[in-house]
Amino acid sequence: MKQNHSWKGWFSSVRAWGCSVQEKRSYNTLRFPMTNRLILLLYPLFIVCMAELNQDKYPSKLVLFISEHPTIMLFNVLIAALIFTGLLLLFRSGWFSMLVESVIYMALSITELFKYNTNGNHLIMTDMKLARSLKSLTSFAYIKITPRLILYLAICLGFILLAFWFNPRLRKRTKLRKRLLPGLACLICCVMVVTVPAVSRPVYALFRLDTKEADNTFILNEKFENNGFLAFFMQTGSENLSNQLDEPADYAEDSDNAIRQYLASDVAETNFKNGVKPNVIEIMSESFADFRVFSKELEELGYTGLDSYYAGLDKAASMGTEGKFIVPTYASYTVRTEFEMLFGLPVKSLNDPNMPQRMLLDRQQPTIPSYYKSWGYTTAYVHPFQSSFYSRKRIYSNFRFDTMIFEDDFTVPVTTYGEYIDDNVVYDQIESLIASSSEPLYLHATTMQNHQPYSDGDSDDEFLNYLSRIQHSADGLAEMLEHLSEANEPTIVLFIGDHFPSLRGDNGIYNQLNITSENCSDLYEQHYILWNNFNMDISDMPRYRDIMHLVAHVLFQYRHA
């Protein structure tokens, strides 16, 4: 009974304190009108500065940016003011409106900070599509809570607490239905700046935003330097929306069986050279790149003996043929290279989306696997990671794969190397599927072992840790090819890397190599190895091509013209 009275007394005390605070806040609203107006007027400038400061890190850099780009800063403040006005009209409460906008701005700012520090790519609106894969993304990211970040968040919280205490708010007791329309109008104006080209183009021109087209990551990063975080986020959002495919005026839906007309329903054995249907294995190795293209520059930085890390790759190349091809991405967006391999179609033809596979969700597609399927092949997709990432299981099920194997589906013993499933496990799974298939096998594998982060390893240098993983992967590849050489089944193996790795932002190896938009072409070229065990004529294989042309060449290489 005493305890019950104690709880009641405690609750009464808290309630009395809350009432006292509320009375004081109501008094402050009336007592300090000028202070409250100043808080309301300063807030848009404050939150813009905090969001940008979180990227610039030091106040001096923010001041320099404002002095060099005053019109862009004005644009940011006006957008923040429109959002704040809209929220204020909807909620009336100044501090609560500030809380909502601050959470949005600082959440985006922190996400941008972590993303750039992770892979050197800046946050864009289309990245929001990956929000459902937050768990996967956090496993990649270099998330470091620094004292500076804590300080900036504390300053934001302090401003909101100040507003809570002085309690600025709309004085007039206007009913919500009368505030709703102007409040929504303010928010809709902000949305229109991003989504409506007729609005965004003159607005961006007026405030002198950098709107040049960016066909590689380094040009995009230069736009970030010119626009700052907030203007960059909005302008690239507008750009991505304007690049969406428009349905032609005379477009008509295909019939249910339309795709079949492009695919032969039955291909006679005589259509294949010597009547042989070989297994076709595509291995797209995550972040596998040959840094020997920068050997001279790396030696000057103290990185020597690169050949030892690539001995397995050189051995595999000596067993087949090798060349270079152009990939559509750098440091991230594996699905762009994967899309070109699975469709034989350049992402540029779809206006260069970051996640092209999401544009083809509604039906079966005429993919490379579907061609093999029509020729009597068994088809398989192997990816040793979560099936939900990039919605692969849901989307790729339309690509005519008979079997899809993700991290929980392996039928061979699973081990890890670094953070992820060992590439040798993938190689073992490939050999197992070849052995168990009664039909010729087409298989596409996208590995995971060499994905970031590279902070864990024998060295404090993430680049050396990356090279150690590459060495392990390349040695395993050479060993697998030796196994397949001894097998009786005719087999083709195409080994490629999807893109150069994500090696931090400001202090990564790319900055040390002084890579810019003018000299970054090597980062969009990848090595390929084509191997077979049945003396296929590969004398006319291209040594330098786009990835989709390379896949098409392999597709028809062993068939009669």
Predicted regions and their residues:
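Transmembrane and membrane-interface helices of multi-pass
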Residues: 2-3, 7-222
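Alpha-helix capping and helix-coil boundary motifs
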Residues: 54-66, 93, 225-255, 266, ...
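Helix N-terminus capping/helix-initiation residues
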Residues: 57-58, 93, 124, 146, ...
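Short alpha-helical interface patches
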Residues: 119, 127-140, 147-151, 236, ...
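Membrane-interface micro-motifs in multi-pass membrane enzymes
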Residues: 119, 125-128, 220-228, 232-234, ...
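Alpha-helix initiation and N-capping motif
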Residues: 128-131, 226-229, 238, 256, ...
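Membrane-interface segments at or immediately adjacent to transmembrane helices
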Residues: 197-282
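Solvent-exposed soluble domains appended to multi-pass membrane proteins
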Residues: 265-274, 278, 282-285, 290-561
